[in-house]
Amino acid sequence: MALLGASFQIGRSALAAYQSAIAITGQNIANVGNPNYARLSGRLTALEGGMTLSGIAPGGGVNLSGLQRHVDAAVEARLRMSASLRAGSQATYDVLSQVESLYNELSNYDLSTQLSTFFNGFSELQNDPDEITARNLVLDQADAVIGTLRRQRAALLRQATDLDAAVREGAQRANQIATEIASLNEEIVTQDARGPGFSAPLRDRRDALLRELSELMDIQVRERDNGAINVYVGSEPLVEFNHSRGLEVQTELSDGLSRATVRFADNHGTVVMSTGRLAAQIQARDEHLVGQLQSLDQLARGLIYEVNRVHSTGCGLVGYTNITGTYAVNNRQAALNSAAAGLDFPVNNGTFIVHLRNRSSGETITRQIEVDLDGIGTDTSLESLAQQLDGVPNLTAGVTADGRLQLSAGSGYEFWFSEDSSGALAALGVGTFFTGTDAASIDVNSTLRSDARLLAASLTGEAADGENAGRLAILGTQSSALLSNQGIQDFQARMVNTVASAAATAATAQEAADAVHSGLMAQREAISGVSLDEEAINLTTYERAYQAAARYFDILNILSTEVLNLVSTR
């Protein structure tokens, strides 16, 4: 009977082991559609048993000694790295493709076409300088350029603001993930102490969170002996066992823009990220968007200055009777080229000529005005410049309370300027075409809007003279010191080409990252994924084993009955 007892133990162990194996297979099948699930399998091991009457020891049955969770740590680490690169390249491409779409090149409404139309308008004005319609057309074409510059700048600012919001949202989610991982660490250690398999669902959840976190930022994971993990961003720990340092977002003002930065909540230290969606969004904002904003402002600044420089040295169908500069100085006694003066545009050592004409007689006098900025002796300030101009007969000059040059002709006189080698007229906004200093503030001078006759198409002030309009017409292709010695149209084309090239590079990087990630996902699926075909085979195997064990029990019951009958008949 003792031997039958051992046989019963073998049967009981088989029923228990294969019942558990069937349950594991069922769990795998139930989670076949769960992308975060890692396949489980039981480890069946033979039990030792006593010796039979024949002198052999067949064993004591079978035991499900452990539960294996099929995860390759190396593949998971590479998968997290590829997820970070993939999310980062996608974010970069999204930003650049939006900028590329914003510029809307190869259409009739892109900036390059509008700039060409604007400068061509001056060519048409040169051919018919006395025609008001041609003058109004130039002003309309200028408004088209201005509208596009403003719209593009506003769109870039909105995009930068949207990226800031995305960084805040991403950092908030990363903080939630880090907190949950710290909590899961503690739960996993507790569940592991209960026995094999208790922590498997928690580990699945933790691995899924790590993959999500890796999309936001590049992380390194180190598992501790107790099953908990530490998470690092760069060389800084983010999660250590059951403690998360936390993440926060701080706002910094730089280049006139509000920028969100990600920091550790405990010491406010900067979180150094090299890949991932957050790193890409921050980099795209700071390099691409801010860079494009600066380039757009530089383009507008160059356009304003170069057109104003030429326009201020020409004459319209009528001269000025009074004029107030559009740009003010901070200090009227400071040299015009000094930081204290605070002018936005350059002024050089040179001269310009003022022309004063009697409207009745046509008699014109000219005076050369010195702009002494050679750094020797007393350099020209706005105040001293006004004094020089005030010395011209029938011309009154002064400085307004807010630091702008103001000129008025005597009764019956008009004036204009020519041959300005100093750039002072353009820098002070005297006789200019544009106002403003960047893509946000650029506009057509209100004096031209009020009277298109003041558009300076002439150099001499004589009828049918369109020479200055011709000078304005070729500005689009002439190099400008304010545009890194490129022409206005070349500078704009290079801006667009830079974005297009960066977008193409980002698209290639995205495709490469997608390919690598897909390959690693396939590897993970082969290791951790559930195959219904394999599980069906396992289920059949375990089912038959269980049935055989049950049949084995039936046989043991029959033998037991026969033994008892033999004993009772004696």
Predicted features along the sequence, with ranges:
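Structural signature of extracellular appendage/secretion-system components
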Residues: 1-570
